[in-house]
Amino acid sequence: MINLKNVCLAALLSASAVTATAGGLLTNTNQNIAFNRMMSREASIGIDGVYYNPAGVAFMKDGHHLSINLQTAWQTRTIENDYALFNYNVKNPTTPRKFEGKAFAPVIPSFQYAYNKNRWSFQANFDLAGGGGKCKFDNGLGSFEKVVANIGFLGNSLAPYLNGILPVNPNIANPATGTMGGYGYTYDSFMRGRQYYYGLSVGAAYRINDHLSVFGGVRGIYATCNYYGYVKNIAFVGNNGAKLPLSTMVDRNDPESSDIELNTDQTGYGFTPIIGIDYKTGRWNFSAKYEFKTRMRLKNKAVN
């Protein structure tokens, strides 16, 4: 006999995994306040160059140079899903549907440090290379509701057998049979994600002459993430708003037997080399920095 709860949980985990990895890791590039004034920083000769143009920092004056930055960021992300069975959600019978998430990062710290001596420049940079905050979807995700909608479709296919327990709604077209008389569905859902990718880079630049300098360094990244979400109170809705909880079909003695909850931590780290070059002549300055791909292996730990 198939365990319905295990099937639902597997579907939810698959859906959340797709959601978590679809966008990949987005590298943050606003690692200095100067970026907010002008985004073209790749040829700058200043302390922010520790991140944007490390080779060019070698042309700064001898001594210690330090920049400390604190920023705040917020964002609203909207995901649209047009799954046809969403029309059977009695709380919101519409499709396409928009799922809105709000992200807020009160403090995004970073610092750049350089010590220049003669032709050498020794540098360090700390930042949030990726992530930096939390995002909440108060009504869950479309991928979550798709699982519930498919369960609703299963309930409609069983309507001839369930009608004695839960009378069908004569005003609903049954998606399984194409005839009038079916069930809607209802549920509660929530999703929250948190990502922090801490980056620390160290390296040295060497001024070959008054026009040319080169840089070599390494960046280490430590990742810590958490994803929490749930789908609860799944029920079929029949005539006059009557409900049949899914839990009565899974384990009638446990009202939470059909609830699905996900709470997963991810941690990992990686290292990557960085190289750079800067050439200046007169009023012109040309520079390039290449940061190799960072290979990271994230370890998953399911809390529940």
Language model features by range: what are they?
Residues 1-8:
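Bacterial N-terminal signal peptides that target proteins for export
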Residues 3, 19-20, 185:
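Intrinsic low-complexity, intrinsically disordered segments enriched in polar/basic residues
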